[in-house]
């Protein structure tokens, strides 16, 4: 089971249009299940897009750390047996305070939303 990233603006816009948005305190999550044919032909089941703006933190090192944390969270959640067979795409947009909150709380919040809506 592997995860591939959304590559270009067109893919991000498509998922934003087709997906359902969830606003949490530390992040915004967009999940799309009914994927168009460009995604269905792919060998991957999970597509991930991460948007970390400069407003969140000016330092690139911190923004990259946030992206690594998000990728790791998604790997943990998607490794669940229920999600390994489902094709879906998601975009995660972290908010202020994301880098300070502990990992287990983020894991709980994200998995709660993903498992409920997949």
Swiss-Prot record:
Keywords noted in UniProt: Endonuclease, Hydrolase, Nuclease, RNA-binding, tRNA processing
GO cellular component: ribonuclease P complex
Gene: rnpA
Listed GO biological process terms: tRNA 5'-leader removal
Entries under SUPFAM superfamilies matching the protein: Ribosomal protein S5 domain 2-like
Record EC number: 3.1.26.5
Catalysed reactions, semicolon-separated: Endonucleolytic cleavage of RNA, removing 5'-extranucleotides from tRNA precursor
Source organism of this protein record: Rickettsia akari (strain Hartford)
InterPro entries: Ribosomal_Su5_D2-typ_SF, Ribsml_uS5_D2-typ_fold_subgr, RNase_P, RNase_P_CS
MF terms (GO), sorted A to Z: 3'-tRNA processing endoribonuclease activity; ribonuclease P activity; tRNA binding
Function: RNaseP catalyzes the removal of the 5'-leader sequence from pre-tRNA to produce the mature 5'-terminus. It can also cleave other RNA substrates such as 4.5S RNA. The protein component plays an auxiliary but essential role in vivo by binding to the 5'-leader sequence and broadening the substrate specificity of the ribozyme.
Family per record: Belongs to the RnpA family.
Top-rank taxon: Bacteria
Protein's recorded name: Ribonuclease P protein component
């Amino acid at each position: 089971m592997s995860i591939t990233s959304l590559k270009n603006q067109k893919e991000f816009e498509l998922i934003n249009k087709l997906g359902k948005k969830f606003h949490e305190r530390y992040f915004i999550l967009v999940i799309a299940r009914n994927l168009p044919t460009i995604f269905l032909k792919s060998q991957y089941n999970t597509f991930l897009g991460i948007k970390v703006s400069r407003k969140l933190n000016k330092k690139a090192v911190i923004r990259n750390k946030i992206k690594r944390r998000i990728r790791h969270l998604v790997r943990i959640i998607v490794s669940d047996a229920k999600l390994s067979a489902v094709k879906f795409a998601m975009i995660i947009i972290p908010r202020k305070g994301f880098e300070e909150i502990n990992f287990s709380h983020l894991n709980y919040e994200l998995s709660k939303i993903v498992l409920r809506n997949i």
